[in-house]
Amino acid sequence: MDPLLTKIMPDRPGLIWMEQPVPYLRYSLLSSYPQLSHAVFTRNGGMSCPPYDRLNTSYDVGDLPRHVAANLAIIKDTLCARELMTMKQVHRTGILVIRTGGDRCRVQTPSADAVITNVPDLAVLVKQADCQGIILFDPKRSVLAIVHCGWRGNVANFLASVVARMKGEFGCEECDLLACIGPSLGPCCAEFVDHKMIFPEEFQAFRVKPTYFDLKAVSRWQLLGAGLTKDHIQISDICTRCRTDLFYSYRGEGTTGRFGTVAMLKQGEPRHANVH
């Protein structure tokens, strides 16, 4: 690995750092499954200029569209994806299900905060700048979910809804699901001065200082409550606000870009998909 990247990339157990064609990380929990491709891209290696430097994935933050398009093309090529799909993330609980079979229905930028799919060669990207990007994977049924979860998603227990939808739509069993929670706002920086107004009482168990909360631990607790097993959950302890050299942080920077968490199924031959 490039010596400069070695200096800036934190050494964390369970994270596999890659540097080509641009820097990104992979999870050890998911990396042994050949039917799944995934990556958490850093902010480095793209085309965008400050304050969006450099691998910004969002058209909605003020960056030049041609730079965003070039960055998304880099990500698509890195995963060798046939298609790359993004969502219009709205900090709510909308779930889009894309399944194989039937006529192809194209949805360019659906309003949703989670996608569940069994379609191969379709890469789905979550845009982040402090919120959690979470990958859920059922290796037995080759079903993938990718979730954007901010504090509002935690309050709504959005992850439990995603798990229930995976079970209802594809017959997934909770004990088979693997989950990875990526770089996001850490307990060191997740301050909510009005927490008594916005958080339910049970979140007090995750308060680390008078106004600071561990939202990654909240997500783990909610996944366990949804039926996942403890050893099937991996959490990155990287805080995006602390590591703006690697990731974008809305809290830390204000006007800035969005980094991407991407996942894609690879098994079998490509099939047509229905979206609903």
Where are these regions (language model features)?
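Active-site microenvironment for binding and transforming phosphate-containing groups
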Residues: 1-276
